[in-house]
Structure formats: C-alpha cells, structure tokens
Amino acid sequence: TLRNAIDQALAADLGRFWWAGGKLRYRSFAPSVGAPYPVQAVRDNFAKAARTYGAEQRRRHGVRGNVTPHHAGVIAKTEFSTWEFLLDDEFMGRGLIWPKHLSVVFRGPWPARQAGAVLTQARDLVATLRDFRNRLFHHEPAWKRYGVLTEADALQHLQEKIGKAESLLALIHPENLRLLQANGLLRDAHRACTAGEIRRFQHLAQVHKVNSLGKLARLVDQSALENSALEARVYRGSQQRFLLIPS
C-alpha cells in the first residue's frame, strides 16, 4: 500500500522510472560528494531490484543478455526498506519529493499540521513495522522485546503493533483501513493476540454446552461483543463440537 502510494505519486511527476537518471534529488547534494546513506540505500535497493527482475526474466523465459527493465516488475522486487529510506529528511525541502507529494501519498487525517512532523511520524511507523515484519520473516518470536516479561506484556506489545499498522493505513488513505475492517482481517488479528486465543490453542478454553437455541443465541452475541472464538458442544445422539467465530 505504501509502495503503491509513493510510486504512483512520483511516477506521475517524474516519469515511470523516477528513481533512475538522477531524477530523485536530495537536500544535501554537493558536487564531488558522495550521497548520504539513505539516498545511497535507495539507489542500491533499486539496482538490486532491477538485477533480481532481470535474473527472473532470464530464468523464466530463457532470455539471454540484458533484459529491458519493466516499471512494475522492478517496483515489485524492491525491498520494504526502500520505502522507509524514501521517507528520510534528505528528500524533504524545496523542489524535492517532500513536502510536494506528501498530501498525495498520505491522504488520511494528518497527526500534525507541519509536513515535517507528518513525514517523521510516517517514517517511524514504517520503521517499526519493518522491524516487526523482519522478525516474523526470520521466524523469530513476534512478542519478544525488551521489557516484555509476562504474557500480558507480550499481548499488549502485539496489540500495539497492530495499532501501528492501522495508523499507517489510515494515514495513507482511510479507505485502505475501511476495506481491511470490512473484510475482518484487523478484527481477526486483534483476536489472535488475546489470552483467550492462547488458552484455546492450549486446549484449556471453556467448552460451552449448548442445549437450547437461547443458549446458542447468547453465545453468538458474546462472541461478537468480545471478538472471541468460543467452543461449543452439542449432543445430537453423539457429541459434536463447534467453534463460534465473529464474521
């Protein structure tokens, strides 16, 4: 979502290959002086993405030699860090991509009136989520962090991360957040990070005996109100178990 928002804004202004040919200017530029780390990181990431795209095309289609870069193909191969680096203050200033395109990329309610403060908050959100994403991709415990000592600490930490994702989505465009809410994805994520779900997967959750439609209706209401998955047991000749999940 962030990738597409930035790409669409910059492509409309600087052309489809806006990252190439020196189009992406930065604040501290000086002749014969190397680019600062965030700027060089963006360049390196796009160069790597182009190589990855080319290698994939040669492998998939049996093409030899150079492969003509394809805008969407290169963008799709960029690392997530690319978009964090693009939010660096080096790209903020007169004639630069920020704040010129800030209101196009971040169409939701701004947390501050100053463009610089908005850019900083967006960058902090992305940095936090990138670190969390990397932890998940490397199969590290998602809940681990300094100061997390108890189950309650871990669950609060995970809920905070979901909140960060919601904040970033809302900042980019409220419609993005609305769609995820409508599909139940965020609700499911919040429910997954609860003590009730831990107990359920430990097979320690209460199993509710359903012996009437009234009891079933009350459990359905409870599940929806608490955003919880409830285990139910029904006897119809033999015992049958069901899971009630909000939809």
Range-by-range predicted roles:
Residues 1-247:
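Amphipathic alpha-helical interface elements
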